[in-house]
């Protein structure tokens, strides 16, 4: 109730900021050098030096950076009570879903860049991956969630052999 008036007044800017920040973080994770990031109420841009790829282009639609930031804090924290982290994970994931529903549409430049079918398939795959990590992390912690996810993924991939 305290932050709602601030959020409603600045919602367009905050969702655009989140979108561009996710592009920036994804490009840094891909070892590119950030050049600039501009954010306005209804549009923004992120420029970096290096190669682009589908992850950088579509990260804002499938990579909830604020939720992962909270998961990282949860990993580094000595606080044993998960309630505050669970609340923050819910709030940040809700914000990401709000951004996703507002920004994901067939005419979005990022989605058209790689083709709609490839883009939506990529987004769906990453949503499943992130949902499994986040849901498991809420109960068992991020470290166990990542280990479980990757062990399970490799086991399932190698099972036919």
Regions found by a protein language model. Name each.
Residues 2-17, 53-54:
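Short pre-active-site segment immediately N-terminal to the catalytic Zn-binding motif
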Residues 24-41:
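Short, charged cytosolic
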Residues 7-8, 19, 48, 84:
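Generic hydrophobic alpha-helical membrane-segment signal
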Residues 12-28:
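Active-site recognition of the HExxH zinc-binding catalytic motif
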Residues 40-161:
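Metalloprotease/metallohydrolase-associated module, dominated by Zn2+-dependent proteases
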Residues 1-6, 27-32, 132:
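A generic, lipid-embedded transmembrane alpha helix
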